[in-house]
């Protein structure tokens, strides 16, 4: 080991182009915290004109799955988060899957051992605990650096017993300080972090080694990741110093630790919480523009009074130094409201087209829309764009327009709000609509107002509820008169007559 490791700690050159990375493990369904990390790395790369590298940390064969990997790709593709190097794209540092980089890690590991930065540890956990007890210390305190200076004779004796050593990196006997891009100056006191394992007894390198090695070889300038990884930073800085000394790394990257994402009750959002599942929100009808906007707010904002912004505005204004250190709470209501604003910002034709998958999922239309279904959608979409927060509301708002007259079922809350005057109102509506030659929204409104508001003396706020329930089955629907026009005379009259008959029968 040279003396340079403790004194020569090169930092990222001021003129170095930004190179950031997103390196998830393919385990489980993508969660909002993971995707927020991807988003912030992507936004910083795009803002600075830098490079985003996408790696996969797939060294845990027991937990990694191809399904999870495909879900990560699906999530990034849906949100429009692209990368410049990495999986499925290629680049100068292939391969980008850790499971395919074993020879690289073994080569680096051998150099670390040869130079003395990494040493063999033969102690069993029981022996470590016994040594702590003998000193009157907590037996669960962790490794005590006992094997740092074993002689060759001691190592040979342990091997003769059949012991296989793990490999540990020597932590420097000094404070380790760094300036976090989000949190400012952070110091870990000397002795607070024990020497740590970088390879198992079977020789397999651990995440603690391979992650920084990949970052070093790929020239990553900023490591932007979750706050849960903050405690690992002093170990990685120590490893970087060693990697610089042996010529693997050119500099130590900057670190920025993004705030925790909290759930209900100010608890950290768990992977088991439905709100943490990115696809849960997609299935409920979030659009990429709305969800990206809200995910960016989990630690960053355009300004103190601007919650709504486009992806282009995010890229133009994002600065990692502006990210807040305080935990961010995932508020579903606020996220939904923000999504609604983005729904209303969509081009009308784009909005109309985005409703189709939700109609299809509800079984309301087939793979290809019929001419009549296209006509209904063309006319109905503008009626609900200003009212919709989630595209998942499509079935509830528009389903009645695509169902047959005999498929309308009155919802319990709609039935409950029908007054005693409902039969009379429905009779008046039938009488007013049957003779109409011009079955347009304007003519329908005039006829119904004259028949129900003027003729029956019912207040406008209450006058049309029974008609709305008859044609839609709901208490709330798109504008009634326009809906009747879309349904047409025959369906409108059939549905009103059906509810009138049902009320008479009961």
UniProtKB/Swiss-Prot annotation:
<comment type="function">
    <text>Catalyzes the attachment of glutamate to tRNA(Glu) in a two-step reaction: glutamate is first activated by ATP to form Glu-AMP and then transferred to the acceptor end of tRNA(Glu).</text>
</comment>
<dbReference type="Pfam" id="PF00749">
    <property type="entry name" value="tRNA-synt_1c"/>
</dbReference>
<dbReference type="GO" id="GO:0006424">
    <property type="term" value="P:glutamyl-tRNA aminoacylation"/>
</dbReference>
<comment type="similarity">
    <text>Belongs to the class-I aminoacyl-tRNA synthetase family. Glutamate--tRNA ligase type 1 subfamily.</text>
</comment>
<feature type="short sequence motif" description="'HIGH' region">
    <location>
        <begin position="24"/>
        <end position="34"/>
    </location>
</feature>
<dbReference type="InterPro" id="IPR004527">
    <property type="entry name" value="Glu-tRNA-ligase_bac/mito"/>
</dbReference>
<feature type="short sequence motif" description="'KMSKS' region">
    <location>
        <begin position="268"/>
        <end position="272"/>
    </location>
</feature>
<dbReference type="Pfam" id="PF19269">
    <property type="entry name" value="Anticodon_2"/>
</dbReference>
<keyword id="KW-0436">Ligase</keyword>
<dbReference type="InterPro" id="IPR033910">
    <property type="entry name" value="GluRS_core"/>
</dbReference>
<dbReference type="InterPro" id="IPR020752">
    <property type="entry name" value="Glu-tRNA-synth_I_codon-bd_sub1"/>
</dbReference>
<dbReference type="InterPro" id="IPR014729">
    <property type="entry name" value="Rossmann-like_a/b/a_fold"/>
</dbReference>
<dbReference type="GO" id="GO:0005829">
    <property type="term" value="C:cytosol"/>
</dbReference>
<dbReference type="InterPro" id="IPR020061">
    <property type="entry name" value="Glu_tRNA_lig_a-bdl"/>
</dbReference>
<protein>
    <recommendedName>
        <fullName>Glutamate--tRNA ligase</fullName>
        <ecNumber>6.1.1.17</ecNumber>
    </recommendedName>
</protein>
<dbReference type="InterPro" id="IPR000924">
    <property type="entry name" value="Glu/Gln-tRNA-synth"/>
</dbReference>
<comment type="subunit">
    <text>Monomer.</text>
</comment>
<keyword id="KW-0648">Protein biosynthesis</keyword>
<keyword id="KW-0547">Nucleotide-binding</keyword>
<dbReference type="GO" id="GO:0005524">
    <property type="term" value="F:ATP binding"/>
</dbReference>
<feature type="compositionally biased region" description="Basic and acidic residues">
    <location>
        <begin position="128"/>
        <end position="147"/>
    </location>
</feature>
<dbReference type="InterPro" id="IPR020058">
    <property type="entry name" value="Glu/Gln-tRNA-synth_Ib_cat-dom"/>
</dbReference>
<dbReference type="InterPro" id="IPR045462">
    <property type="entry name" value="aa-tRNA-synth_I_cd-bd"/>
</dbReference>
<keyword id="KW-0030">Aminoacyl-tRNA synthetase</keyword>
<dbReference type="InterPro" id="IPR020751">
    <property type="entry name" value="aa-tRNA-synth_I_codon-bd_sub2"/>
</dbReference>
<dbReference type="GO" id="GO:0004818">
    <property type="term" value="F:glutamate-tRNA ligase activity"/>
</dbReference>
<feature type="region of interest" description="Disordered">
    <location>
        <begin position="124"/>
        <end position="147"/>
    </location>
</feature>
<keyword id="KW-0067">ATP-binding</keyword>
<feature type="binding site">
    <location>
        <position position="271"/>
    </location>
    <ligand>
        <name>ATP</name>
    </ligand>
</feature>
<dbReference type="InterPro" id="IPR049940">
    <property type="entry name" value="GluQ/Sye"/>
</dbReference>
<keyword id="KW-0963">Cytoplasm</keyword>
<dbReference type="InterPro" id="IPR008925">
    <property type="entry name" value="aa_tRNA-synth_I_cd-bd_sf"/>
</dbReference>
<dbReference type="GO" id="GO:0008270">
    <property type="term" value="F:zinc ion binding"/>
</dbReference>
<dbReference type="GO" id="GO:0000049">
    <property type="term" value="F:tRNA binding"/>
</dbReference>
